[in-house]
């Protein structure tokens, strides 16, 4: 969540194992996906991040970045919804 003013949240909740494997392009892409996810459900960026982290959406974005970044952000959000739902998420 670079540049979002959430540095305290980032320090508290970020799994730095993800950060060490992310390229300089993945970080802004992940940030954009988190923000778009929040907009889709009218929730804060913080809540979107916490939800995606809890239901493995962040891990999904990291693992499948090579395929996901070629699609639109909206398509990535659609994929996140499905992936999180398959991991116990409740937003749809």
Per-segment meaning from a language model:
Residues 14-92:
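C-terminal alpha-helical interaction appendages
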Residues 1-21:
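Short, Lys/Arg-enriched N-terminal segments with co-localized hydrophobic residues
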């Amino acid at each position: 969540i670079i540049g979002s003013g959430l540095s305290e949240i980032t320090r508290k909740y970020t799994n730095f194992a993800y950060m060490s494997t992310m390229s300089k392009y993945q970080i802004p892409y992940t940030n954009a996906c988190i923000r778009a996810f929040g907009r889709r459900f009218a929730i804060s960026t913080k809540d979107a991040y916490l939800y995606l982290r809890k239901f493995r959406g962040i891990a999904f974005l990291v693992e499948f970045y090579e395929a996901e970044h070629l699609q639109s952000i909206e398509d990535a959000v659609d994929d996140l919804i499905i992936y999180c739902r398959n991991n116990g998420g409740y937003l749809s």
